[in-house]
């Protein structure tokens, strides 16, 4: 893929392949604003409104609807048509109450699945890394750009710090309260967020750790008993015994 960073405009021909846009009909595509998701892992809000959900026929119509505040992402109204919407984000159409989640799907990389109002109250966010901040408290840095502070009563014995990198938090939106924690262990139910196995779901059989994260290999078993391997980078925990999010029919 051609370089897309550092420029204000994006040619349609070099836009991410999973964007459902008419590349031969239009020279330019909407370039996402800098935000919680990189360009190769998100949709601009305009593309969701116009090309995926079909609420507008043209970019002008989509921009108007978005600027009027008809769409929420993770519980907050977003009026920027370039806003990047990515993995596990929840989209709500304010006027109709319809809600959708962005999930990994085979071949297309990312897609939307309609969810009910209860499920739309939370999202899953993977812990990418942890840092210790002033006072000895722990800050969890999540895949969607969020930071969650874990307050520690005794920095010398931080019993509150039960969270490990690459585990997943179930958090309320928009309040960002931790509802659940799913560690990445053997037996954890995961979905694959990238690579040739993108969108596949299964339980972790084993984790062979390499020197770096991208060289660590995870063996996973799907519901049919088929085993496959993928990079640790692509493994996203979604539950312990059952998924905490709705999946496409037949995925698990």
Swiss-Prot record:
GO cellular component: cytosolic small ribosomal subunit
Superkingdom assignment: Archaea
UniProt organism field: Staphylothermus marinus (strain ATCC 43588 / DSM 3639 / JCM 9404 / F1)
InterPro entries: Rib_uL2_dom2, Ribosomal_eS4, Ribosomal_eS4_central_region, Ribosomal_eS4_central_sf, Ribosomal_eS4_KOW, Ribosomal_eS4_N, S4_RNA-bd, S4_RNA-bd_sf
Similarity comment: Belongs to the eukaryotic ribosomal protein eS4 family.
Gene name of the encoded protein: rps4e
Any one GO biological process: translation
Gene Ontology MF terms: rRNA binding; structural constituent of ribosome
UniProt xrefs under Pfam families: Ribosomal_S4e, RS4NT, S4
Protein name (database record): Small ribosomal subunit protein eS4
Entry keyword annotation includes Hydrolase: no
S4 RNA-binding domain ranges (all copies): 43-105
Leader peptide range in chain numbering: none
Keywords: Ribonucleoprotein, Ribosomal protein, RNA-binding, rRNA-binding
Amino-acid biosynthesis found in the keyword field: no
């Amino acid at each position: 893929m051609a370089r897309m960073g550092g420029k204000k405009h994006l040619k349609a021909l070099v836009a991410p392949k999973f964007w459902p846009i008419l590349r031969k009909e239009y020279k330019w595509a909407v370039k996402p604003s800098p935000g919680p998701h990189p360009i190769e892992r998100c949709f601009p809000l305009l593309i969701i409104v116009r090309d995926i959900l079909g609420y507008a026929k043209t970019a002008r119509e989509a921009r108007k609807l978005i600027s009027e505040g008809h769409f929420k992402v993770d519980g907050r109204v977003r009026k920027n048509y370039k806003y990047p919407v990515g993995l596990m984000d929840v989209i709500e159409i304010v006027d109709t109450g319809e809600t959708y989640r962005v999930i990994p799907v085979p071949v297309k990389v990312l897609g939307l699945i309609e969810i009910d109002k209860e499920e739309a109250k939370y999202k899953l966010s993977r812990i990418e890394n942890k840092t210790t901040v002033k006072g000895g408290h722990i800050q969890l840095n999540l895949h969607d750009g969020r930071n969650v502070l874990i307050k520690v009563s005794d920095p010398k014995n931080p019993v509150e710090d039960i969270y490990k990198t690459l585990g997943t938090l179930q958090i309320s939106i928009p309040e960002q309260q931790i509802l659940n924690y799913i560690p990445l262990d053997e037996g954890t139910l995961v979905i694959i967020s990238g690579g040739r196995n993108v969108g596949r779901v299964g339980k972790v059989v084993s984790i062979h750790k390499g020197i770096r994260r991208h060289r660590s290999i995870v063996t996973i078993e799907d519901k049919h008993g088929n085993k496959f391997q993928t990079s640790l980078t692509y493994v996203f925990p979604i539950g312990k015994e059952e998924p905490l999010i709705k999946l496409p029919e037949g995925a698990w």
